[in-house]
A protein has these predicted regions:
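Short hydrophobic beta-strand that contains or immediately precedes a catalytic carboxylate
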Residues: 17-19
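C-terminal accessory helical subdomains adjacent to catalytic cores in phosphodiester-
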Residues: 2-14, 23-54, 58, 65-224
Length: 224
């Protein structure tokens, strides 16, 4: 079969995802594949949990080096000469948006890029569940009874202290199926399948930063 191949095929490269757990990694994978359809089949994951946002100095450097080494290792397993086109490292800040978020995101991402050259630190505020609250219709598509109360709609969800509690106690309630962290990939699949990602109801700076990073990665790392 002849014809021009995609950037990933030509350069024998993969995108690597690291995160706190499997649910977060799978959620990120779903979102990345929507933004960059050429990545389907070209994403691999690191299973080790991520603990970066509180690290500084030599400790941060050491932890990032461990992730970078593992990323390069899983890339090599895809075939001789395969390189890491880009690394996405996800972690929840477990705190609301503010100066700490900006400083932490910058500090960790700079270290990732210093060691690898092409990487993005996906630091969710306050956690990835805050992203889900931007898409009430997607949550209802997963479980019809799940409803986001009006007081949480159209807001900056990065300012919510405990989005997970909101989902567990107020969105899914006490009757029927209750939200758990294992529902995250299904929720984000509903976000994509319903096209809700194009018009979030409210705002979240970390969500916007993530999509800006994906667009930048597509231009600079995957199709350069």
């Amino acid at each position: 079969m002849s014809g021009r191949k995609s950037g990933l095929e030509r350069s024998r490269s993969v995108v690597v995802i690291a995160g706190e757990d499997r649910n977060d990694r799978e959620s990120l994978k779903i979102l990345l594949e929507e933004q960059q359809p050429g990545l389907r089949g070209g994403i691999v994951q690191i299973r080790d949990p991520v603990r970066l946002h509180k690290a500084t100095g030599a400790n941060l450097s050491k932890r990032v080096r461990t992730i970078v080494n593992k990323a390069q290792g899983v890339a090599e397993k895809q075939g001789e000469g395969t390189r890491v086109a880009c690394l996405y490292v996800h972690e929840d800040l477990d705190g609301v948006d503010g100066n700490v978020y900006l400083e932490t995101r910058q500090r960790v991402e700079q270290e990732i890029r210093r060691q690898l050259g092409c990487g993005h630190y996906v630091l969710a505020v306050a956690e990835m569940e805050a992203w889900m609250l931007l898409f009430p219709d997607a949550l209802s598509a997963v479980v019809k009874a799940w409803k986001v109360p009006a007081k949480y709609r159209g807001k900056d969800t990065g300012r919510f202290q405990d989005p997970k509690r909101i989902l567990m106690r107020e969105v899914s309630g006490t009757k029927g199926r209750r939200y758990t962290e294992s529902d995250a990939p299904e929720v984000f699949r509903a976000v994509i399948d319903g096209g809700y990602h194009r018009s979030p109801l409210g705002s979240n700076r970390s969500w916007s930063h993530f999509y800006q990073d994906v667009e930048l990665c597509g231009r600079q790392h995957l199709h350069g």
